[in-house]
């Protein structure tokens, strides 16, 4: 796999519902993307829903839009749906779907993509990096 780009995420809110068998986390966030082909910011409304049931792998599903400019200065928006599983060791691997409204960039996102979540060491403990890879 080859590194494609990173998305910097800042967690802005957290809500949880918990029972004896299931925990659901609702995480809101903002952030940005700095890639050679695109620079942009995550719009308000980004949310990650995580579900953890006893005896099953945890699941996550994040949806958000990044609005910015391509490397030629043209307005560009990316819709990202990032679904994945959390393993017992806490690592998370995802299968992102990315829809791009820029005809020149859109083919870049037609490849099989894989995402990995990387924690960022910061005092607030509210930041992660989503690393996107191509096959």
Where is each model-derived feature located?
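Beta-strand-enriched cores of mature, soluble protein domains
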Residues: 1-135
């Amino acid at each position: 796999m080859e590194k494609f780009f990173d998305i910097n995420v800042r967690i802005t809110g957290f809500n949880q519902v918990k029972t004896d068998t299931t925990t659901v986390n609702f995480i809101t966030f903002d952030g940005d993307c700095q890639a050679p082909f695109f620079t942009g910011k995550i719009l308000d409304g980004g949310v990650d829903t995580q579900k953890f049931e006893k005896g099953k792998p945890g699941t996550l599903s994040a949806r958000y839009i990044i609005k910015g400019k391509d490397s030629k200065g043209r307005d560009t928006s990316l819709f990202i749906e990032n679904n994945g599983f959390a393993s017992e060791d806490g690592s998370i691997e995802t299968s992102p779907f990315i829809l791009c409204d820029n005809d020149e960039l859109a083919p870049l996102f037609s490849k099989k993509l894989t995402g990995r979540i990387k924690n960022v060491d910061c005092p607030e403990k509210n930041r992660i990096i989503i690393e996107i890879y191509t096959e």
